[in-house]
Curated annotation (Swiss-Prot):
Belongs to the nucleoporin Nup133 family. The keyword Transport applies. This is Nuclear pore complex protein NUP133. PANTHER family: NUCLEAR PORE COMPLEX PROTEIN NUP133 (PTHR13405:SF11). GO terms for molecular function: structural constituent of nuclear pore. Pfam families: Nucleoporin_C, Nucleoporin_N. It is found in: Nucleus envelope; Nucleus, Nuclear pore complex. Keywords: mRNA transport, Nuclear pore complex, Nucleus, Protein transport, Translocation, Transport. Its main location: nucleus. InterPro entries: Nucleoporin_Nup133/Nup155_C, Nucleoporin_Nup133/Nup155_N, Nup133-like, WD40/YVTN_repeat-like_dom_sf.
Length: 1285
């Protein structure tokens, strides 16, 4: 697609097998500078700077933006970024002449690169800034380097397939930063001889495992395979995975061009091979297939029970699984046709213009859900009758995770979208070139892929919507070919990393996302190789137009790409600005530089306002961006060649001080120009960011001083000759700096050529990343296998660093308080969730160390206790700030508040327990002990804890300390100081006394805190009456007791929100409690001597009778059912009706009798139902027959009817001895009989008339109710006649 920047020299001299003299080749990047050398590169400097000679972007970033702000998209931003040099051992090996053909590769999981030259294999981490320190050189055994037929040595590095096996089973990108220290194995397999070499742990220095030459694998031919294919049976692909990490056992799967699939079991004792029998017909597989193998899931997501891998053939994708037990059996799970007659499932063949379809390679995303296939299609142009190649990407996704039974014809995959054509018309290449192409996915920008060709080119394809952009990675010619590409693993889970490229001679490079998005061009009609084509421009013309092979104008034509960049990506370190923003930022830079020179700010506010400098708020504001550029400036004289020694340089401290001075001048510029007032009123967030940059810069300076002090202390401690310098430099803070710098380098590839420490001390505005890495990487900074004393020391170092950062930031804020805008609703950076989580991570680890009481001496525990005490204060301040900001913004903060309370109480409880242990230890060391001495020791130990608890409402620990000291004076002082919402600490103390049932102490203490006591009593009504009695408010106390006795479940006792500890499941007052409350209420009414006290007392007595009735009635209910629950009168009556009995039928009327007339009026229908139920309790037809046959006299009638339910109900409700005589009678609601037949009022007689036996026994029914309502003496039966007569 693109051509190299510089025209390449003729290759004849470079292809000579024997060099003319034994000197390094002239194109070696490490060739020493010589003044008399023939420089055939015009722009190459005489200093021997490694290729390419153009300045690196990170160096150009030091230039003031004012110099190039008017150039649009800077071409330097579209260049690749240098990541790391080759290890020096590899450079030395490259300097020797020879005819060996080199090869190399990169592993995404372990971030390791490997390079084969001659008989040596170099393996190193391409992330470290000093690769030479971690470079491992592996020697290939002689037995695998001898060709059996010719006896010559095999020096072709391209004949080897290499895979790295990670024994670290941890999942996620967050742990990959530490994998360079983890043990890894290497498996190598020769494409031609099938020889396998295995190193189980390359970092341990052990020898290679016995190599299997596998002669029978070469000569053996499977059934159905022609001899011509057997000759071309090179292995195409190799994949490996760990089986048992402890035993260093792994398996490797390889596929060959003759359709065979081989399985190798590798262990430290040897390598075993086994051919996998495929169920596909060998004759149906085209020559050169299967092409590639790949695991369906990444190592972190792979299931331990089995492993699945995919195999690409000329028309299908096959999925296989490996069952680890009992003998690592490989079996096919499913297959999916990608080239066939069904265009919906893949690529439709037999189209008129198609001649041949070549699936070249496939890749799977990290989640194992999306499969991408690189496809080359040979087509015929009907107009010119010429052939051309069309390159495209086929994207498939899994429909489900189901496994299908044998013979079941269902599609497992489906097309994610239409096939994406990346090059519509290209030159027709030979088969070997097509098969040399490789595909990589998973890099930035999301959705992009990189295509590697056999001649050493790399092209990034970025498809966005209907648009496709191609970016060609190209360096000056002496960089050599591109050997492999990978993804720079991000430190964030489920995030994409930048593309990294391994070159033949220029080390490792990265392709920034911005370069791909802005520097990509439309797909041309040309090949992906370096060869020229008839329809492309000359190389010389192309290089004159596009530096580094990038057409800048084409990169800005597509509006979709620009829309993506307008949103920006802060983690990448760039945001697309409008022309107005760029003008404003340039103007601000000029005005500020003028202020630094002259001290004048004439008209700055008006000029900046007209330029739109105040249009944006937040990080996009030009003032905030200027502040960020000041604090994040890279020093010109910082280099990456000195590695860890950079921490000893005073230049870091002086550079930070220079930044601080410049930032202070920037604040003064804002104040004098009145821009500060404008920002304070309109862009509060922007002003907050500016001042927080000052906080972070001050904190970074103090952190640097802390590191200097740690280094000095360690130097004094390890000053003996036996101590190594590496031990002196290594400390917890240094390791944390490395992790933070590494994370910044990964997220911003423009910094990949910088040292971790340099990046850390330069990226001041991202200081909160310290706490992110502390939360994610603590287990690697403080390892479990380290001695306990070392863990303690490193934990204290990290705690001290965190406290230094936050305390310095708060001090800066206090000193510049007048500069800050109103912060309502703004979350400070030191109160963000990432900071709180990082602080809690180290605090919880220190709490864990404190629990190791038996293994830690008292002095070490005292040291960590002191550090934890200080750390607790800054942790709680951070959590409180986050919670209050959420509250001010009226956002949901319940979860955050609960987390804050939990962390606070956990730390306080642990610190208090430890303080008591220290007190006991101190007391044991005193010969003359007194009670006062013990108390003083205890107070001194707890003084700091009380101080912190007061500021963060640690009421629980404050109460414990006062209770254990038995100090009422201290308790009262804290109650006066602990003022807060809902009564503050006083409310908590009252609650504790209430739970302990010390009511008298509670009320006596409440005399001093009356307002707080009233708040408490509103939620504890069972104590209100006691307070009212104490104030001689007897009437109010009686009403309170009466209400309390009849309170329902949801109203009784303490509300759930106010409970501070676990409550019993049954917190309802019992019947005995309710009776006691009612009796106390009656006593209080009598003591009040109110004129209306008699009626109130009768009402109380009625309620007592209702309680008694409920006790009697609920005895008939099943055991335990609502025994203590207070029934409402209507519920009690309905219960009586449901029980269906004579006794309960009569009790229902008694319940009515003890209620009020208003209740009876409101429940008239329920009363009528009670009368119907009472009539049903007797056999009135039998009574009628007996009275007729036996001729009952008046006395016999009375004797027989007085036992009926109707008689008893009438007697209790209407008789002279009725139950309730003070609140009206039943006749007002439901009379026995209507006095006036024309009256519409219902009566008991009307209710009974609906009874089934009323027609015959109606007279007896009426007689029963009328007999019950009068005196029994002198009854005249004839007076009661039925209206039916």
């Amino acid at each position: 697609m693109f051509s190299p920047l510089t025209k390449r020299a003729k290759q004849s001299s470079r292809n000579e097998k024997t060099p003319r003299n034994r000197v390094p080749p002239p194109d070696s990047p490490v060739t020493p500078a010589t003044q008399n050398r023939n420089n055939f590169i015009s722009d190459r400097p005489a200093t021997g700077t490694p290729a390419p000679w153009a300045p690196r972007l990170s160096v150009l970033a030091r230039v003031s933006p004012g110099n190039n702000g008017d150039k649009g998209v800077d071409s330097d931003q579209l260049k690749p970024v240098f990541v790391g040099e080759f290890p020096q051992l590899l450079r030395d090996e490259q300097s020797y002449p020879g005819d060996a053909c080199v090869s190399g590769g990169m592993d995404k999981e372990t971030c390791l690169s490997w390079f084969i030259t001659g008989s040596k294999v170099f393996v190193w981490s391409h992330l470290t800034t000093l690769p030479s320190r971690k470079c491992v050189v592996l020697e290939l055994p002689v037995v695998v380097l001898v060709n059996e037929e010719s006896g010559s040595g095999l020096q072709d590095g391209k004949s080897w397939l290499v895979n790295v096996v990670s024994w670290d089973t941890s999942a996620g990108a967050a742990t990959r930063a530490s994998r360079s220290r983890s043990p890894v194995g290497v498996v190598m397999c020769n494409r031609k001889t099938r020889a396998v070499v295995y190193w189980s742990d390359i970092f341990s220095g052990q020898e290679a495992a016995p190599a299997e030459k596998a002669r029978h694998l070469i000569k053996r031919q499977s059934n159905g395979i022609r001899s011509s294919r057997a000759e071309n049976s090179d292995l195409n692909s190799l994949i490996t995975t760990a089986v048992a990490a402890a035993e260093r056992l792994c398996i490797a799967i390889a596929c060959s061009s003759n359709g065979e699939l081989w399985q190798f079991t590798c262990s430290p004792t040897g390598v075993k091979s086994n051919q996998v029998q495929l169920n596909i017909s060998s004759s149906s597989v085209s020559e050169g297939y299967p092409r590639s193998l790949i695991w369906r899931f990444s190592q972190g997501l792979a299931r331990e029970s089995c492993w699945e891998f995919l195999m690409l053939t000329d028309c299908d994708i096959h999925c296989f699984t490996i069952e680890p037990y009992p003998d690592l059996t490989v079996s096919e799970v499913w297959q999916h046709e990608i080239v066939g007659t069904d265009g919906d499932s893949g690529i439709k063949k037999d189209i008129a213009s198609q001649k041949q379809i070549w699936p070249l390679d496939l890749q799977v995303d990290d989640q194992g859900k999306v499969i991408t296939v690189l496809v080359a299609t040979i087509c015929m142009d009907r107009a010119s009758s010429s052939s051309y190649t069309q390159y495209s990407l086929l994207t498939l996704q899994h429909k489900s995770e189901m496994r299908f039974a044998d013979g079941r014809e269902e599609k497992v995959l489906e097309k994610q979208g239409p096939i994406q054509v990346i090059i519509p018309k290209a030159r027709v290449e030979d088969k070997d070139f097509l098969f040399s192409m490789r595909l990589r996915v998973g890099g930035r920008p999301p959705g992009s892929a990189i295509i590697l060709s056999g001649d050493g080119t790399a092209t990034v394809c970025y498809c966005h919507g209907s648009s496709t952009r191609l970016y060609k990675f190209d360096l000056p010619y002496d960089a050599g070919k591109v050997l492999d590409a990978s993804v720079l693993s991000s430190t964030d889970e489920h995030e994409y990393g930048a593309w990294t490229v391994l070159t033949e001679k220029a080390g490792v490079w990265a392709i920034p996302e911005k370069a791909v998005v802005l520097g990509g061009v439309e797909p041309p009609e040309r090949s992906l190789s370096r060869k020229n084509s008839s329809n492309e421009r000359s190389t010389r013309d192309e290089t004159r137009v596009t530096p580094y092979g990038v057409d800048r104008t084409a990169g800005r034509e597509n509006s979709d790409i620009q829309n993506i960049e307008d949103k920006g990506n802060p983690k990448m370190g760039f945001t697309r600005q409008t022309a107005r923003d760029e003008e404003s930022e340039a103007l601000l830079g000029q005005l500020f530089e003028g202020f630094l020179l002259s001290g004048k700010v004439d008209g700055s506010l008006e000029k900046l306002s007209q330029s739109g400098a105040f249009d944006r708020d937040g990080e996009a504001n030009v003032f905030a961006r200027k502040s960020k550029s000041i604090v994040d400036t890279l020093a010109k004289h910082w280099t990456t060649t000195r590695g860890a020694e950079i921490v000893a340089m005073t230049v870091i401290s002086s550079q930070l001080v220079e930044k601080q001075q410049k930032h202070e001048n920037f604040l003064h510029f804002l104040a004098l120009s009145k821009c500060h007032e404008e920002l304070c009123s309109k862009q509060r967030h922007s002003l907050q960011i500016i001042l927080e940059n000052g906080e972070k810069l001050a904190a970074m300076i103090q952190l640097r001083e802390l590191q200097n002090m740690i280094n000095q202390n360690r130097s004094a401690r390890f000053g003996s000759p036996q101590a190594g310098s590496e031990d002196q430099v290594s400390c917890a803070l240094w390791d944390l700096i490395q992790f933070v710098g590494e994370r910044a380098r990964r997220n911003t590839v423009l910094l990949m050529d910088r040292d971790n420490a340099e990046v850390f001390y330069s990226k001041v505005s991202e200081l909160e990343e310290v706490f992110y890495c502390l939360n994610r990487q603590l287990e690697y900074i403080i390892r479990a296998d380290q001695p306990l004393g070392t863990q303690l020391q490193r934990a204290c170092e990290l705690s001290n660093a965190c406290v230094t950062i936050l305390q310095t930031a708060l001090d800066y804020k206090n000193e510049h308080q007048m500069w800050y805008p109103p912060l309502e609703g703004l979350i400070p950076w030191h109160s963000q969730t990432v900071v709180c989580n990082g602080l809690w991570c180290i605090a919880s680890f220190m709490l864990h160390l404190l629990t190791e009481a038996s293994r830690i001496d008292i002095s070490a525990k005292s040291d960590i206790y002191t550090h934890l005490e200080v750390l607790t204060e800054v942790l709680l301040e951070a959590c409180a700030g986050s919670t209050f900001a959420k509250l001010e913004r009226e956002e949901e903060n319940k979860g955050l508040l609960n987390e804050y309370w939990t962390r606070r109480d956990t730390i306080f409880d642990s610190l208090y327990r430890q303080a008591k242990e220290f007190m006991e230890a101190e007391i044991q060391g005193i010969r003359e002990r007194t009670e006062a001495t013990d108390e003083d020791i205890f107070r001194n130990r707890c003084s700091n804890l009380i101080s912190i608890a007061k500021r963060h409402a640690g009421y629980k620990i404050m109460w414990k300390i006062c209770y254990d000291l038995n100090d009422t004076g201290l308790l009262r002082n804290l109650m006066h100081e602990g003022v807060g919402p809902q009564g503050g600490f006083s409310y908590f103390v009252f609650q504790q006394l209430y739970d302990m049932k010390q009511f008298s102490k509670l009320l006596r203490l409440g005399e001093e805190f009356q307002d707080e006591l009233l708040i408490f009593l509103k939620r504890h009504s069972d104590l209100v009456w006691l307070h009212q009695v104490f104030l001689h408010q007897f009437s109010s106390a009686s009403d309170t007791l009466h209400t309390l006795a009849l309170s329902q479940d949801e109203e009784s006792m303490t509300t759930v929100e106010e409970r501070t500890g676990p409550e019993p499941e049954d917190v309802q007052p019992t019947f005995a409690d309710r009776k006691r409350f009612l009796n106390l209420s009656k006593i209080a009414y009598v003591a009040d001597k109110d004129a209306d006290s008699e009626s109130k007392v009768k009402r109380i007595e009625a309620d007592l009778n209702l309680l008694k009735l409920q006790e009697e009635i609920t005895k008939a209910l099943p055991n335990g059912e609502a025994r203590n629950r207070l029934f409402r009168p209507e519920e009690l009556i309905e219960t009586c009706l449901n029980i269906q009995g004579r006794w309960t039928a009569i009790k229902a009327f008694e319940v009515f009798a003890w209620t009020s007339s208003s209740f009876r009026e409101n429940h008239r229908s329920l009363l009528e139902e009670c009368w119907r139920n009472a009539a049903d309790q007797d056999d009135w037809d039998r009574h009628h027959q007996a009275s007729t046959n036996e001729g009952w006299s008046e006395e016999e009638t009375l004797q027989n009817l007085r036992n009926t339910a109707l008689f008893q109900a009438s007697k209790r409700c209407y008789g002279p001895t009725r139950v309730n005589t003070f609140d009206g009678d039943f006749a007002q609601v439901l009379p026995l009989r209507r006095e006036n037949p024309e009256d519409s009022t219902s009566s008991v007689e009307d209710v009974l008339m609906s009874h089934k036996d009323f027609a015959e026994a109606g007279k007896l029914m009426l007689t029963a109710i009328m007999l019950g309502c009068v005196e029994e003496e002198g009854i005249v039966a004839e007076e009661f006649s039925s209206p039916m007569e």
